[in-house]
């Protein structure tokens, strides 16, 4: 509660204490926690307590139960009531943030966007929430593959962070924008942006872990930029710096970061995730450079690390890392003739994608492509053709499309359908 508000009633503190006790029990007693919070409304509390309780109920129901509709109802009430209460930013914007997550989960993106836009509009005097909501809306546009709108929002965020004196968060916004520009293959525009990022990162003096994490983000983008441009030899110095950064971060204490500027209250990735990501880009470089044994060695290390992390951490990004690593190592196995192992790993990718609709949508074309390559390796040309044809229908990625067409062409040549089938490519893209 804010200091300028009267002390809360004893009944409220008692119910809140019980609710928190049940929530943090092992195992959590969510039903009892919810009952305690619902009991608050029996006392007809003032608006501040009413709004906060609706937020707490919505958050508990969203994170710990499947009753999403009831969670949404409480969060909508929290958002509505909190807008009528002065100086109640945390409740107001947290309600908007979680509510927009639920809308996205329910594919109600057209409800999430205006909610986030309004929250962004009225949060300009609250730097932490303004930046967080900008990141959230940019992420929503990215998931919709509207990278232009996402880049615009990240640009707005970078300028806002500069104005409020947060060079750290300005760097995060700018690096995020650079990442999206790499996704769009805007290589000529990425170079000056990365140069700016490098300057901001090197000049920023602050928490050592935050500084090293910015440096890792920057170097990851540099490596990706060089690999996209086919400049494999230019990657080595960046990889060496990345490995040094990870070693430095691992020696730093993970104390809670409490910066003076509230706009600095962000962190890119946990250091354990960064470690896996460095393994991943090392594997990508090794594959492009033709160092297949090295690629296998780093993939094995990364997958072992991922298995340990996933026992304690349910973050979706870990499954994404795992799928990308497996996609690379499967290519390695097929090139080196380890077909049975490749098939087992393709099965692992299938299982991971089945657990996440978004992962399946993003990797279905790659999965069918890998199956097609496996079919070629065991001389099942009809099956290879079917897999590649399906993959073509699922991808809008130009480089993957070219790779699939090249392999499909090799299938047609082996089958003797060269002239008849090549004509189809003219109309397929």
Located regions from the model:
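Amphipathic alpha-helical segments of tetratricopeptide repeats
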Residues: 37-43, 76-84, 117-124, 155-163, ...
């Amino acid at each position: 509660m804010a200091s300028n508000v009267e002390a809360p009633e004893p009944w409220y503190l008692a119910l809140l204490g019980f609710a928190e006790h049940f929530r943090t029990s092992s195992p959590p007693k969510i039903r009892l926690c919810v009952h305690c919070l619902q009991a608050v409304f029996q006392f007809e509390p003032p608006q501040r307590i009413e709004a906060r309780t609706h937020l707490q109920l919505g958050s508990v129901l969203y994170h710990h139960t499947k009753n999403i509709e009831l969670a949404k109802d409480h969060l909508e009430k929290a958002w509505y009531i909190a807008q009528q209460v002065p100086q109640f930013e945390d409740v107001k914007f947290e309600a908007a943030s979680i509510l927009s997550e639920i809308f996205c989960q329910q594919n109600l993106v057209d409800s999430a966007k205006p909610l986030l836009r309004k929250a962004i509009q009225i949060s300009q005097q609250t730097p932490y929430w303004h930046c967080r909501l900008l990141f959230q809306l940019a992420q929503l546009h990215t998931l919709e593959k509207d990278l232009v709108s996402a880049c615009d929002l990240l640009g707005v965020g970078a300028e806002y962070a500069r104005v409020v004196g947060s060079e750290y968060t300005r760097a995060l916004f700018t690096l995020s924008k650079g990442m999206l520009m790499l996704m769009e293959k805007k290589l000529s525009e990425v170079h000056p942006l990365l140069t700016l990022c490098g300057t901001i990162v090197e000049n920023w003096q602050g928490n050592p872990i935050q500084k090293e994490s910015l440096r890792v983000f920057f170097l990851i983008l540099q490596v990706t930029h060089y690999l996209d441009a086919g400049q494999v030899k230019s990657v080595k110095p960046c990889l060496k710096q990345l490995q040094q950064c990870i070693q430095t971060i691992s020696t730093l204490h993970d104390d809670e970061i409490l910066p003076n500027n509230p706009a600095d209250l962000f962190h890119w990735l946990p250091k354990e995730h960064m470690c896996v990501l460095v393994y991943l880009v090392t594997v990508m470089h090794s594959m492009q450079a033709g160092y297949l044994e090295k690629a296998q060695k780093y993939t094995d290390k990364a997958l072992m690390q991922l298995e340990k992390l996933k026992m304690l951490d349910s973050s979706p990004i870990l499954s994404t890392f795992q799928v990308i690593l497996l996609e690379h190592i499967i290519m390695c196995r097929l090139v080196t003739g380890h077909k049975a192992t490749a098939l087992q790993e393709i099965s692992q990718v299938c299982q991971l994608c089945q657990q996440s609709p978004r992962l399946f949508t993003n990797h279905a074309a790659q999965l069918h492509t890998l199956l097609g390559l496996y079919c070629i390796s065991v001389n099942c040309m009809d099956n290879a053709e079917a897999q590649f044809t399906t993959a073509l229908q699922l991808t809008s990625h130009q480089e993957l499309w070219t790779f699939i067409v090249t392999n499909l062409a090799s299938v047609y040549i082996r089958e003797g359908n060269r002239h008849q089938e090549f004509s189809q490519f003219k109309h397929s893209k």
